[in-house]
């Protein structure tokens, strides 16, 4: 069973087509990285999934039920834009107020549970206005987790966070999907962070889904390569191309060898041809580079 199945989803705002016959499949228990440029339709799609916007056409199924089914709506939570917190209230009081609004029984127990999940047990008495940006994001996630949702939709939850803040959010999301039966959709422009946690990806452009893939499929499309520099790069490229199948120059001025060979073999081969290597390393194509290459090549019709 899939957590989300979207077919031919369209949303218009007057003459503007924000989402254009979009298809999306999100497996249960996955962390789905939703990627796209500003204005590509990510937030609009997320708001329709969460019931905050009504589609112009198309269908949304959540756990095999129509997204409007009351029996499934309580299992969907989101953090889109800033959490609705009272600045002068403590973290505890904000969460208690939200638990009351949701009609949750045993509110104190539930608030303690979500505070533990987001690692903020020791910050419950802090006023929200005095929290760091990273802590405020975790308060927002805690509010979304009240009531034990099965599906959590997060829009740019790590923007503006420092490295430690991003690490904590990463660990929280992995814990939610691994140990608490939650499925997570997360959109972010920080693709290096998404690559560390996502199990599935969807890439949207101009309101259309142009690529969906698993982390394993991404890995197979992001090969390892050897990058190197010499004093005479033109000669080096000619020499390397005489032996290896795929040799390319990148934007940083490095030559890349994509054949499955060792750095030692490449250095020896070049030395035997009178070329000394100044720099050499092994690397792989990142999600960010894959995405940029895809955007350059893909034409949406």
What is each stretch, according to the model?
Residues 208-229:
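Conserved beta-strand-loop-alpha-helix hinge in the C-terminal portion
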Residues 71, 219, 237-240:
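Short loop/helix-cap segments at secondary-structure boundaries that form the rim of catalytic
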Residues 4, 11-186, 191-205, 209-211:
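ABC transporter nucleotide-binding domains
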Residues 28, 91, 215, 284-287:
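Structural motif detector for alpha-helix initiation sites
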Residues 150, 181, 198, 223, ...:
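Residue-level detector of structured alpha->beta connecting loops
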Residues 1-10, 297-301:
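ABC-family P-loop ATPase nucleotide-binding domain
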Residues 224-294, 301:
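Short, charged/small-residue-rich alpha-helical element at the C-terminal edge
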């Amino acid at each position: 069973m899939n957590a989300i199945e979207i077919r031919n989803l369209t949303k218009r705002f007057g003459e503007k087509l924000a989402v254009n016959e979009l298809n999306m499949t999100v497996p249960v228990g996955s962390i789905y990285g939703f990627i796209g440029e500003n204005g590509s339709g990510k937030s609009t799609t997320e708001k329709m999934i969460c019931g905050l916007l009504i589609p112009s056409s198309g269908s949304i199924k959540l756990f095999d039920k129509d997204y409007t089914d009351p029996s499934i709506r309580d299992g969907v939570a989101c953090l889109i834009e800033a959490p609705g917190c009272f600045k002068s209230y403590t973290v505890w009081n904000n969460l208690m107020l939200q638990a009351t609004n949701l009609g949750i029984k045993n509110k104190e127990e539930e608030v303690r549970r979500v505070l533990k999940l987001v690692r903020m047990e020791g910050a419950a008495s802090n006023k929200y206005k005095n929290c760091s940006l990273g802590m405020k994001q975790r308060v927002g996630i805690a509010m979304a987790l009240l009531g034990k949702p099965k599906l959590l939709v997060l829009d740019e939850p790590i923007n503006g966070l420092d490295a430690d803040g991003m690490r904590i959010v990463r660990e929280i999301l992995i814990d939610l999907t691994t140990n608490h039966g939650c499925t997570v959709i997360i959109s972010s422009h920080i693709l290096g962070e998404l690559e560390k946690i996502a199990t599935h990806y969807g890439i949207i452009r101009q309101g259309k889904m142009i690529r969906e893939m698993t982390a394993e499929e991404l890995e197979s499309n992001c090969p390892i390569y050897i990058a190197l520099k010499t004093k005479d790069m033109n000669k080096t490229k000619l020499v390397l191309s005489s032996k290896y199948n795929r040799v390319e120059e990148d934007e940083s001025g490095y030559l890349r060898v994509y054949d499955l060979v060792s750095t030692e073999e490449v250095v020896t081969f070049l030395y035997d041809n009178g070329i000394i290597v100044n720099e050499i390393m092994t690397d792989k194509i990142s999600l960010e580079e894959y995405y940029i290459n895809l955007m350059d090549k893909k034409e949406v019709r």
